[in-house]
C-alpha cells in the first residue's frame, strides 16, 4: 500500500520530522509515501497567484499570510537530498501539489523543469481565480451549474498541459455539498480520457472531503484510468 499525498507544512524540514511519517507508515503497513508541499509555500510559485490574490480582500489576506511563512524551493530540495541519502524501510518520494492556473502554465513549467521531484500533483482549487473550497458562504448566489462546467474545463486543461503526474482530488468541487442539476457523465468521461491519454493517475483522496463520486469512479474504471 502507498500514500502519495502527505503534507509537511506542520513541521520543519528536518530528518526527524520526516521520520515520524516513516514510523507511522510502518505501523499502517504502508510501503511507500510521498512527502508534499503546496506550491503557495514557495516564492517561486507566487507569480501564479497574482490574479487570485487580487480577486477580493479575503483572498488577499489569505495569500499575504502564506507569504509570511514562504520558503525557497532550494530549502525543500536540500531537505529532500538529506532524505534520499538515508535508507528507510518505507520508500520516500518527494513531490509538490501545484495549484493550476492555466494562464501561468509557463511559470509552472519553468519552476519544475529540472525534474527534481518524483511526483507533481496538479490541483484545481481556484475557478477563474476564485477559491471555491475555503468558505461555504461564498457559494451563495453563484451559478452552480456554470461552476461545475468551468471546474471540469480547468481540470481538462490541467491534464492536457502535460505538467503533472497526478490529478489531485478531482472531485473537490463537491466539498460543500452543492451539486448541479445536470448529469456529469460526459464531464467525467472527457476528463478520464484525457488523464488516460497523458499517462497520468487520478487521485483517490478522501481527506476532509467527499472523495470520488461513485459515478465518477465507475467512469474512471471503465476508461482504464489508474489511481494513486
Which residues make up each language-model segment?
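Short, conserved acidic/polar surface loops in the N-terminal third of protein domains
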Residues: 45-46, 103-108, 131-134
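Short, acidic/polar
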Residues: 14-24, 103-111, 150-158
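Short, structured secondary-structure boundary patches
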Residues: 52-60, 216-228
